């Protein structure tokens, strides 16, 4: 016996063993089956042999005899339903593993015995499902002769299959599912025959077609009255759905015969006319299953190729009328699915059919019905996007010469169709035609040239003739933009030149093309900018001096020049000719402009950055999905470009460094980003040389500063800080040999009196530690760095504290375990910083403190006490631990100043919250007892910190530790319950509320001092009141409260500074909110206008009832306030949302909002000066479309307005808050 057969029979044994184990099951049906199996196996135990086939036969005979006992032989009615179900279930299992010869020879006898289990009235779903399984195994075992009935059987296999097909339409879901699985399995296992098609395939397909066609016929014959009966309609729809599921199951086997394809398509398209969406969806699933199966069969064997084409041809032949909206949309969806599936498996053959699809869709695009021509346009867009594979669009030698010519011919045919589309015949759907053209350019890319040039010329004439085609301007510009991306700006400029210098009717000006070139250019030739656009810059700049200074013409010229410069970054995005066009001459020209033209620095720096960045990112891509770009511009070209740019980087960096030093600090982050990009591609030798040059400049700057020239020339310290910025930027790319110079620089600048220099000194350590090699270097010089950090503590500038604390945290993380004395020497400074006025310093101090605690808690740590000032040199080393760290901090509790004591308590609060689980409870309680004493201090600063610490303990420490401390804590806290300064009363009240919640009201009441009972009573009443309101509050208020986020950045902040106001039921805030909602909930308002008084008898009255007070508006009130492009108010005060403008593609580009030369001209006219009264020049005040003008007396008017604002209501006038200061994106 072979291995597969052994595994097959072992699988049967496993299933029988599982049934045997259910003999004690609580489910009666499982238990009965197990008992039957056990009884049968005991009966045949004496007949068991080594021949497994004979054992299977014994099982079949036994179970068949039991089935005979359960069925009445004369009436064929079932006498014992349970015995019949168990026997049939076991037969279903055994038949699956039985020899096919046996089932084939006994087919008629077995089928006759199993038939009553399906046809009897008493047959339930489990019995029918088991009988279907038996019938499935029987039918799979039959050969072609049996199916064709050459044996002259009384009951043929087709009769059994028909029974299963009828059950596949049964109303019972589980029976139907089992029958569908059986049909699927039978068709997937055809008998051996000359053809791969199952003998019964035509029979099954005919049954499916007739069944669905009959139901649809019944549906069409129903009267309107019957259709209105919901039950009748639902029953028919359910029957359609069951038939569709059967068809899908059959089609998915790949056995649907070719002769039945046309009737199937016809009937499925009939279903798509239904108004029920789920039926339409199910019919599409049938189509999709058919397409998918045929395509897979075509790939595997090639047998279904003609069948698939026949299906597509049938669908095209069944095209509906171009006025039938519903059917047309459904039919088009089937076309899309068929073409996309075909293209997945046969890309070239699918591409050959696309011109035919365009020809067919002409009929529907010519339709005057919007739904029809919109559906047709979406069809063509989808087919272009999904059915044209990029691999076919490659040039030779990547594709065969014959394929290349074939594809070229197909593209040419499609392009000719577009020329017809752009004719007057399709003028009603021009917008849709232009969208299809955009999809064509996006798909064919470089292959669009030269086939689509005629279409482009037609669209260009539309754009030039702006008056006639104004409503299509956006779509036209999308087409031209797509053509720029596809064929490159050089081809577009050749066909549609700018003509900016001397426009005329024969040579129309195309200033509107500049924003399109800016937005759509990519992977173009940099030479196009140099040869086509740059000459216009010089031409227009030469005209600046020839026109009046404040004239509109000058503003138009400046706008054009700005637009031309805005295209440079896009030409620098992975250019095709970088090595040929980015010459020394061009680079030096850009460099001189960086020095001379301040307003161009952003654009030129962005262009230089993109030039390097695009090549680096492209070269680092392991695999690109854009096969067309890969062929046109291989990755090796990008690598050559990087090597070429690296030879220019030294000079470019020198220019950028100089420009950086000349630019104000709040407006030069973009220069640093460009510098960073070129540092990345600079060779190690050049980088080291550049670094040495900067170090030399830094040394000179520092020498001049120290020699006293700083008093004469205030910019020198600024220069030092600027050079340090550059050095910090270079750290990431420096070789290890330069690290010693960095450490020297750090030690020289860390004690500088200038805060900017000091901050950058500390950032050297922080930046260096981010690198793996840098961390190693810091660890190597850790002793020297520690000494420098400790010695420089006295000279720290206030604004440099945060940078210093970050450096300390970095050093602590890198400390060796025998250098923990550094923590002891710097912890006092960190603790004091927890009370710093600067928020960033405070947050960094807390992070550093926690980092120190974790370092001290590491095993095998050693504190060398003799190295700490004040300790005897013979003092032995001390092992580190978190407990030892807490003891070290305790020295701060007896500090000389109140500020030190307060800071130490705050530090303890942070550390207890973080390390409460690692710390010994005895030490925790000692610290608590000590700090609790400070609640009796006369210093409010100390008490405030102590209250915060006790709150952390109350919330975080175990209940058994805190319960004994509560009585004494209450006495000390209540000393401050009458103190309003510094919110002491509120803080004490919140802690008591927390205590009540944690230890219970009774326990707190028992330990509460008698003289302060009023406070406790107040808290109790408030809690009870809030509980009652919680029960009454609406769901809406609960949702609002639930969605409110936490105001705190960390759990520690919430514990220390949070209160019941944020998350307790007993909060005053929630009480106010709930109370306010409840009080105002009953208020309602009637909205009416003077013209239309409210009719209380009208059915629409409820629409005029509002829960908020309506605003009254008149036509002239706040007119400017509502003059907005996005919003407006109607006569009743309701907000009306207009169309929002599309977001700009380039936020940083100030010219991105200018979409065309005409717009730029109008903008210049609007914002230009006009002559007012007394011949004074007036300018518009705001940048929008306001009609207000200002003149020389504006300042006086503003002062009068301000005085009126200040004096109004006898209140002090407050200026509006200014916006946030500019923050550099590049952090140093």
Curated annotation (Swiss-Prot):
One of its GO terms (molecular function) is RNA binding. InterPro entries: ARM-like, ARM-type_fold, RRP12, RRP12-like_dom. Residues 1212-1228 have a biased composition (Basic residues). Keywords: Cytoplasm, Nucleus, Phosphoprotein, Ribosome biogenesis, RNA-binding. The modification Phosphoserine is found at residues 1059, 1067. SUPFAM superfamilies: ARM repeat. The keyword Ubl conjugation does not apply. It is found in: Cytoplasm; Nucleus, Nucleolus. It comes from the Eukaryota. In association with GSP1, required for nuclear export of both pre-40S and pre-60S ribosomal subunits. Required for the late maturation of the 18S and 5.8S rRNA of the pre-40S ribosomes and for maturation of the 25S and 5.8S rRNA of the pre-60S ribosomes. Belongs to the RRP12 family. Present with 8170 molecules/cell in log phase SD medium. This is Ribosomal RNA-processing protein 12. It comes from Saccharomyces cerevisiae (strain ATCC 204508 / S288c). The gene is RRP12.
């Amino acid at each position: 016996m072979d291995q597969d057969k052994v595994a097959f029979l072992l699988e049967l044994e496993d299933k029988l063993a599982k049934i045997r184990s259910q003999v004690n099951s609580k489910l009666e049906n499982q238990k009965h089956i197990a008992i039957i199996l056990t009884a049968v196996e005991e009966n045949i135990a004496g007949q068991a042999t080594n021949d497994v086939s004979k054992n299977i036969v014994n099982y079949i005979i036994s179970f068949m005899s039991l089935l005979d006992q359960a069925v009445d032989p004369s009436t064929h009615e079932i006498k014992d339903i349970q015995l019949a179900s168990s026997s049939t279930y076991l037969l279903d299992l055994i038949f699956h593993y039985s020899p096919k010869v046996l089932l084939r020879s006994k087919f008629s006898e077995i089928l006759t015995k199993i038939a009553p289990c399906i046809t009897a009235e008493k047959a339930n779903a489990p019995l029918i499902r088991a009988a279907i399984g038996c019938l499935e195994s029987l039918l799979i075992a039959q050969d072609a002769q049996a199916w064709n009935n050459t044996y002259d059987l009384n009951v043929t296999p087709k009769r059994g299959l028909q029974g299963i097909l009828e059950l596949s339409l049964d109303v019972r879901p589980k029976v139907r599912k089992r029958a569908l699985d059986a049909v699927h399995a039978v068709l997937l296992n055809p008998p051996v025959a000359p053809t791969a098609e199952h003998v019964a395939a035509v029979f099954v397909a005919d049954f499916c077609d007739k069944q669905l066609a009959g139901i649809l016929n019944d549906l069409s014959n129903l009267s309107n009255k019957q259709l209105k009966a919901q039950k009748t309609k639902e029953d028919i729809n359910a029957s359609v759905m069951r038939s569709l599921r059967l068809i899908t199951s059959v089609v998915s086997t790949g056995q649907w015969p070719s002769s039945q394809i046309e009737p199937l398509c016809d009937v499925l398209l009939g279903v798509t006319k239904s108004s029920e969406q789920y039926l339409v969806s199910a019919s599409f699933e049938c189509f999709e299953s058919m397409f998918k199966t045929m395509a897979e069969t075509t790939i595997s064997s090639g047998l279904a190729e003609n069948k698939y084409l026949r299906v597509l041809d049938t669908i095209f032949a069944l095209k509906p009328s171009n006025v039938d909206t519903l059917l047309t949309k459904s039919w088009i969806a089937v076309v899309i699915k068929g073409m996309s599936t075909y293209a997945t498996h046969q890309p070239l053959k699918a591409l050959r059919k696309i011109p035919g699809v365009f020809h067919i869709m002409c009929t529907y695009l010519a339709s005057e019905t919007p739904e029809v021509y919109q559906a047709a346009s979406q069809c063509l867009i989808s087919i272009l996007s999904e059915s044209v594979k990029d691999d076919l669009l490659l040039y030779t030698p990547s594709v065969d010469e014959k394929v290349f010519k074939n594809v070229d011919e197909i593209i040419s045919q499609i392009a000719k169709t577009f020329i017809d589309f752009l004719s007057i015949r399709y003028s009603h759907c021009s917008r849709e035609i232009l969208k299809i053209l955009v999809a064509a350019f996006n798909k064919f890319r470089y292959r669009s040239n030269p086939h689509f040039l005629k279409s482009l010329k037609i669209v260009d004439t539309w754009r030039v003739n702006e008056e006639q085609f104004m409503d299509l301007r956006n779509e036209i510009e999308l087409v031209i933009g797509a053509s720029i991306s596809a064929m490159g700006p050089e081809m577009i400029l050749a066909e549609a030149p700018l003509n900016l210098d001397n426009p005329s009717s024969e040579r129309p000006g195309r200033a509107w093309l500049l924003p399109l070139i800016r937005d759509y250019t990519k992977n173009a030739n940099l030479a196009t900018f140099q040869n086509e656009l740059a000459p216009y810059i010089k031409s227009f700049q030469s005209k600046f001096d020839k026109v009046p200074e404040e004239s509109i013409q000058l503003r138009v010229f400046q706008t054009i020049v700005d637009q031309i410069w805005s295209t440079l970054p896009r030409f620098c995005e992975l250019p095709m000719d970088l090595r040929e066009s980015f010459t020394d001459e061009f680079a030096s020209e850009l460099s001189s402009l960086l020095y001379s033209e301040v307003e161009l620095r952003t654009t030129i720096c962005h262009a230089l950055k993109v030039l390097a960045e695009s090549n680096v990112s492209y070269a680092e891509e392991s695999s690109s999905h854009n096969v067309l770009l890969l062929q046109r511009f291989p990755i090796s070209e990008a690598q050559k470009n990087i090597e070429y740019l690296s030879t220019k980087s030294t000079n470019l960096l020198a220019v950028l460094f100089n420009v950086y030093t000349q630019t104000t600090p709040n407006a030069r982050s973009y220069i640093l980003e460009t510098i960073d990009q070129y540092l990345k591609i600079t060779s190690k030798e050049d980088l080291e040389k550049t670094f040495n040059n900067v170090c030399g400049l830094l040394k000179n700057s520092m020498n001049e500063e120290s020699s006293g020239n700083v008093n004469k020339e205030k910019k020198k310290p600024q220069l030092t800080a600027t050079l340090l910025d550059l050095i910090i930027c270079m750290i990431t790319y420096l070789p290890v040999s330069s690290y010693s110079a960095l450490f020297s620089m750090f030690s020289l600048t860390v004690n500088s009196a200038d805060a900017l220099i000091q901050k950058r000194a500390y950032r050297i350590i922080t930046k260096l530690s981010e690198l793996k090699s840098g961390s190693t270097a810091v660890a190597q010089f850790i002793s020297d760095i520690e000494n420098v950090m400790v010695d420089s503590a006295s000279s720290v500038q206030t604004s440099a504290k945060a940078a210093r604390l970050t450096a300390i945290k970095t050093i602590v993380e890198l400390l060796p375990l025998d250098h923990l004395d550094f923590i002891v020497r710097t912890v006092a400074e960190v603790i004091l910083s927890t009370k710093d006025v600067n928020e960033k310093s405070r947050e960094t101090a807390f992070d550093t403190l926690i980092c120190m605690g974790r370092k001290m808690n590491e095993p095998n740590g050693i504190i060398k006490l003799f190295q700490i000032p004040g300790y005897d040199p013979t003092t032995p080393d001390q092992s580190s631990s978190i407990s030892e760290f807490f003891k070290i901090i305790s020295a701060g509790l007896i500090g000389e100043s109140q500020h030190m004591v307060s800071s130490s308590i705050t530090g303890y609060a942070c550390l207890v919250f973080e390390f409460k689980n690692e710390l010994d409870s005895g030490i925790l309680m000692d610290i608590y007892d000590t700090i609790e004493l400070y609640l009796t201090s006369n210093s409010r600063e100390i008490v405030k910190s102590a209250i915060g610490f006790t709150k952390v303990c109350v919330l975080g420490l175990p209940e058994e530790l805190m319960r004994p401390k509560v009585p004494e804590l209450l006495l000390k806290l209540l000393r401050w319950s009458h103190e309003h300064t510094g919110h002491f009363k509120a803080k004490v009240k919140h802690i008591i509320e927390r205590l009540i919640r944690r230890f219970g009201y009774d326990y707190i009441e028992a330990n509460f001092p008698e003289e302060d009972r009023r406070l406790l009573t107040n808290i109790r009443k408030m809690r009870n009141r809030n509980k009652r309101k919680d029960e009454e509050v609406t769901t809406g208020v609960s949702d609002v409260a639930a969605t409110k986020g936490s105001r705190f950045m960390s759990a520690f902040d919430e514990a220390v500074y949070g209160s019941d106001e944020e998350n307790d039921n007993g909060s005053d805030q929630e009480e106010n909110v709930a109370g306010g909602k409840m009080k105002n909930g009953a208020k309602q308002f009637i909205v009416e206008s003077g013209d239309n008084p409210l009719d209380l008898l009208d059915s629409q009255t409820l629409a005029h009832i509002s829960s908020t007070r309506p605003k009254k508006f008149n036509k002239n009130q706040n007119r400017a306030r509502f003059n907005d492009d996005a919003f407006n108010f109607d006569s009743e005060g309701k907000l009306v949302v207009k169309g929002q403008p599309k977001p700009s593609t380039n936020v940083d580009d100030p010219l991105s909002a200018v979409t065309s030369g005409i717009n730029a001209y109008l903008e210049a006219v609007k914002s230009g000066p006009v002559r007012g009264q007394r011949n004074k020049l007036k300018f518009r005040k705001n940048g929008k479309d306001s009609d207000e003008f200002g003149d020389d007396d504006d300042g006086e008017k503003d002062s009068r307005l301000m005085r009126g604002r200040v004096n109004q209501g006898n209140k002090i006038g407050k200026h509006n808050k200014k916006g946030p200061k500019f923050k550099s994106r590049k952090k140093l």
